Swiss-Prot record:
GO biological process: arginine biosynthetic process via ornithine; L-arginine biosynthetic process
Entry annotated with the keyword Transmembrane: no
Family: Belongs to the acetylglutamate kinase family. ArgB subfamily.
Pathway: Amino-acid biosynthesis; L-arginine biosynthesis; N(2)-acetyl-L-ornithine from L-glutamate: step 2/4
Name under which the protein is recorded: Acetylglutamate kinase
Lineage: superkingdom: Bacteria
Cellular localisation: Cytoplasm
Gene it is expressed from: argB
Positions bound to substrate: 80-81, 102, 196
Annotated site, Transition state stabilizer, chain positions: 45, 255
Residues in coiled coil: none
Keywords: Amino-acid biosynthesis, Arginine biosynthesis, ATP-binding, Cytoplasm, Kinase, Nucleotide-binding, Transferase
Phylogenetic placement of the source organism: Bacteria, Pseudomonadati, Chlorobiota, Chlorobiia, Chlorobiales
Any GO CC annotation of this UniProt entry: cytoplasm
Amino acid sequence: MKETDSLTCSDLRPARKAPQTAIGQVLIEALPYIRKFERKTFVIKYGGSAMKDLCLKNSFAQNVTLLRKVGINVVLVHGGGDAITKTAEKLGITSTFVHGKRVTDKEMISVVQMTLAGKVNQDIVQLISEHGGKAVGVTGLDADTIQAVPCRDAATLGLVGEIESINTAYIDLLCKAGLIPVIAPIGFDDDGNIYNINADDAASSIAIALKAEKLIYVSDVAGIQVGERILKTICKAEAADFIEQGIITGGMIPKVLSGFLTLDGGVRKIHIIDGKSVHSLLLEIFTHEGVGTQFISEQDDESNH
C-alpha cells in the first residue's frame, strides 16, 4: 500500500477493473467471517495518520460502515492529541508533556473537551454519515459512560484520569439500534471533575466491559515487527521476551502490555493494523491472511481470527 504522503483519493478506487473471478473470490473468502462475526462487538481505537489524511479518513469511514452493514456492532474510541495541541496554540495555551502524557489543568481540560467532543468527534460522525453509516457522537460524560479517578501522577499531570468503571448501558442501546457509537475519551468523577483519558486505555476498558469479540488498534505501524517481518500472531510469553531483548520498544510497549491485559479481561482477540494502508481494517477482518498482528492467548493458536 502507498504511504500517506503519496496517497490520493483515486487510490480508494481500483486503477483498472479487476477480473470478475477475483472479485468473486474476495467475496467468498469474506463470507465465513461475515457469518462468524454477525452480532459480535468490535471496539476500534482510531488514531494516528488515519485521522489526518482525507483519503485515509474516507477509507476508514467506508470500512466501518461496511462492518456495521454486515451485522457487526462497531464501537469507535478516538484520540485527537494533535488536534488538541493545535487548538491550544490558537488560544495561546502552551502544551506540556511529561513522559508522553499531556499536563492538563482546568484551562487545558476545557480545550480537550472542546476539541475532542466538539470538533474531532463530530467530524468522524459526519464522515461516517457521508458514506451511508449511522453514527452517534458520545463522550464519557454521556449517561455516566466513563467514570474516572485522578491518575497516580495527578500532582504533576493535573486532570489526567484513570478509568474506574464503564457504564455500558448507553453503548448497548446505541448498538442495538443499529448505530455506531463514536466515543471521545473524557471521563468524570463523583465530584463532577472532568478528566482527560488516554484513548488506548479507554478502548481497552470499554472492550472488556462490553465483552467484545475484538479490540482493534488502528495505528501508524503495520503490526509488531521483528527484523523485516511483521508478526501475524504474538502470545504473552513471546511479547515478554521481545520486550526484554529490546525488539519491542518505546510507545509500543504500553500498547502491547495493555493488549494482553485486555485479553486477560475476556476480549477474544486484539489486533494492531496500519491505518496508513487503505482498507486495512477490512483486509484484517475478512481475509485468511490478515494484514496486521493479533495477540493470542495460546502460542499454538495460529488462526487468523
